[in-house]
Every structure is written in structure tokens, then in C-alpha cells.
Amino acid sequence: MGKTVSIFNQKGGVGKTTTCVSFAACLGHKGKNTLLVDCDPQGNSTSGVGIDKSQIEASSYDVLINDVSVKDAIIKTKYKNLSVLPADMDLAGAEIELAENENRFKALKKALAPVVMDYDYIIIDCPPSLGLISLNALTASDTLIVPLQCEYFALEGLSQLLGTVRTVKQHYNEHLELEGVLFTMFDTRLKLNQQVMDEVDNFFPNKAYKTKIPRSVKLAEAPSFGEPIIYYEKYSKPSFAYKKFTDEFLKKQ
């Protein structure tokens, strides 16, 4: 049975989608059959793996709201061992429609159930908010990874995030665990780094990955070409960093 991992931080601009795309691509590259589930209405994970959103026939919205089979919505990408359940702006309306569903917190878990056995890893890109879609993702997940930028304001909301995880564990998914914290957009020139890392260690003891993802122009460029960083610029520092992070993740499994 595959493992489902949500990449989640309710604070935007922390490299969440970049991490989803890069991590999923690295897993596939290392021989793990991987499904990337785009649950962010912006659909950047979808376009980030080369899928034209205007050509999507069925999306995560249709799977959640219109009872479309997840197998009919999944698209196999051109990248090794990597498929995607795409998203588009229709998903923005799903919060309101899910609110009327008596199983509103478990809709995604139910939708993914037919394919959980088909993949080694299912990686979910959550929206940067604590709404119903994010709660669905956490309910459907075995673990979550929190991408975090090493800056003062990045620490805001960590206690709220922990509270959300506790609520999900208590009411919807008792098996949910924190997989780890990944520092992104890391700049070795900033003196604040160590202070933030110490604070994170207080919140999440022994959960921070040793690998840190550097700030890079290449990471910003890759999505516009529909290519994960390990294919767009495979010898770049962020490419090596995401591969190293993936190795670190896999060693703990």
C-alpha cells in the first residue's frame, strides 16, 4: 500500500508547490511510482509538470464534487514514474460545495481510495489556507511535510498549524503524523537562519531535515517551462538539494 504525504503550510510563498513538484519528480526518478495530487486551485503543480490546464478533461474538482472516477482524471506525465491528478480554478468553488456534504472532511480520502494501492507515493499539494480542501488532504494523508522559509514571519502560524493537525488527528485521521520540516529558500548569508531553526526545533523536535533548499533563480524559472527542476537544470544546486532531500526522506521510510 502506498504512502500519502501532504505538503502543507497555510502561509503562502514558502516554496510549497515547488517542493511538491520537485519531490514528486525526484521520487519518480528514483523508481517510485508517484502520483502528484493538485489540490490548489491555482493549479501550479499541474502546469509545473507540463500539463496544459486548458486541455484538462477532468480535475480534482470533478473527483471531489462531481463523482468522476479518479482513474479517469489522472494524467500520466512525460516524466519517469510520475502521474498527476490536475487542478484548475474550478476547485476554488469546492469549499462551498463540500460544506453541504455530510462527509465533507473525507471526500478526498474516499476519492483516492481506488488508486492508493497503485502508487508507492501520493504527494498532495495543499492550498495555502486552513480550509476544507486542506482538511481533506490531511484527512487523506499518512503524514505531512511542512516547507518553511527561514525568516521571522515564517514562524507565524506554526502554533495554528499544530492545532489543526491535532484537530484532524482527534476527529478525522488518528494516524496522521508530521513527517518533517523542510527549510526552503535558504540563504546562508542571513544571520536569522539559526534563530529560526532553533525555534522550529522547539515546535517540532528532531523533525527538521538536514537538507536545505537554497534560494535560486532556476527554481523560479522551471515552472514556466513545465519542467521540474531536476529535468530543467539537473546540475543546479536546487536540483541536487531536492535529490538529497528525497534520499533523506526515503532513508526514514
Model-identified regions with their sequence ranges:
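P-loop NTP-binding core
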Residues: 1-253
